[in-house]
UniProtKB/Swiss-Prot annotation:
Gene symbol of the encoding locus: mvk
Source species, domain of life: Archaea
Keywords, alphabetical: ATP-binding, Cytoplasm, Isoprene biosynthesis, Kinase, Lipid biosynthesis, Lipid metabolism, Magnesium, Nucleotide-binding, Transferase
Enzyme class: transferase
UniProt record similarity statement: Belongs to the GHMP kinase family. Mevalonate kinase subfamily.
Name recorded for this polypeptide: Mevalonate kinase
Cofactors named for this entry: Mg(2+)
Family annotation (InterPro entries): GHMP_kinase_C_dom, GHMP_kinase_C_sf, GHMP_kinase_N_dom, GHMP_knse_ATP-bd_CS, Mev_gal_kin, Mevalonate_kinase_arc, Ribosomal_Su5_D2-typ_SF, Ribsml_uS5_D2-typ_fold_subgr
Record has ATP-binding as a keyword: yes
Keyword Endoplasmic reticulum appears in the UniProt entry: no
GO BP term, pick one: isopentenyl diphosphate biosynthetic process, mevalonate pathway
NCBIfam families in the record: mevalon_kin, PRK03926.1
UniProt-annotated binding residues for ATP: P111, V112, G113, A114, G115, L116, G117, S118, S119, A120, A121
Length: 335
């Protein structure tokens, strides 16, 4: 019998195409090597207990049974963390048709609310750990679908990009609900976190308002973004050498950031981090995600440390990382 399972799932960045994807245009996303780790084991109480560490809700401990929830510690984000994890556990239990007590412990390298897919990563890692504990052998694609279901249950709407990238890993081209894996490329990147977050809902609504008020100006921007994503896909699929690919992708990143800025979703701080990264030698830098705060990322072959230092000096929180070939990973199974 399995004693416990430790699973991990990565964060993601939208490489190209945020906001325009809402209007039916494509996007390219990738998993990055910042991970959430979930350990699952059985308990004798028949209840489910969740402990979360290092995810901006330090020391959070929550227990719940069929009809009661026990907040053993009082933190504002408790319900937010609980909702993704609880639904993930519930869906895994439904798949196994079992009702048992489970302890889940979570640690994470991914900042919450930064636009890096922390919610999807914790859902995917939880489903991965709990399903394996219960003896299920779900494919990554099946786990991605369950992760998407968790997001729909919690958020009411979801494209499925975040849980799919987190479960499957690598590069994914997304358009109108369909995913296409792209060949893997090593991207030496630095993520810069502003320390603040923007509301995706509000930012999407703001772009929608501008689109409705000035379609003749906004539509060409969105159209250019869509063409840019397809150009990036063309470069990734091309037979150019790696250095040429990186240079061209960096150029597209800079253009994409300018288009996002034109839509009004960048901020002074994001701009400062983007330009600090470029000045320090990044060949491309742009915001990633909804904007209004959150994160930017820089492509910095051979210059990651220098770019990270520049981001820190500019007031950001740098994270040196790389694209993750793997998505969900079962780290350990103890019997």
């Amino acid at each position: 019998m399995v004693k416990y399972v430790l699973a991990s799932a990565p964060a993601k960045v939208i490489l190209f195409g945020e906001h325009s994807v809402v209007y039916g245009k494509p996007a390219i996303a990738s998993a990055i090597e910042l991970r959430t780790y979930v350990r699952a084991q059985f308990n004798d109480s028949g209840n489910i207990k969740i402990e979360a560490h290092d995810i901006k809700t330090p020391g959070l401990i929550v227990s719940f049974s069929e009809d009661k929830i026990y907040f053993e510690t009082d933190y504002g984000k408790a319900a937010e963390v609980l909702s993704y994890v609880r639904y993930a556990i519930e869906l895994a239990l439904e798949e196994s048709d079992k009702r048992v007590g489970i302890d889940v412990s979570i640690t994470s390298q991914i900042p919450v609310g930064a636009g890096l897919g922390s919610s999807a990563a914790v859902a995917v890692a939880t489903i991965g750990a709990v399903s394996r504990l219960l003896g299920l052998e779900l494919s990554k694609e099946e786990i991605a679908k369950l992760g998407h279901k968790v997001e729909l249950l919690v958020q009411g709407a979801s494209s499925g990009i975040d849980p799919t990238v987190s479960a499957v890993g690598g590069f994914l081209y997304y358009k109108q609900g369909k995913f296409e894996p792209l060949p893997f490329m090593e991207l030496p990147i630095v993520v810069g976190y502003t320390g603040s977050t923007g509301s995706t809902k509000e930012l999407v609504a703001m772009v929608r308002k501008r689109y409705e008020e000035m379609p003749e100006l906004v539509e060409p921007i969105l159209e250019a973004m869509g063409k840019l994503v397809d150009k990036a896909k063309e470069i990734i699929l091309s037979k150019l050498d790696e250095e040429e690919k990186l240079t061209k992708l960096g150029e597209l990143m800079n253009i994409n950031h300018g288009l996002l800025d034109a839509l009004g979703v960048s901020t002074k701080k994001l701009g400062e981090l983007v330009y600090a990264a470029r000045t320090a030698g990044a060949i491309g830098a742009k915001l990633t995600g909804a904007g209004g705060g959150g994160c930017m990322y820089a492509l910095a072959p051979g210059r990651q440390r220098e770019v990270a230092t520049a981001i820190k000096i500019a007031g950001g929180i740098p994270m040196i990382t790389r694209v993750s070939r793997e998505g969900l990973r079962i780290e350990e199974v103890s019997r």
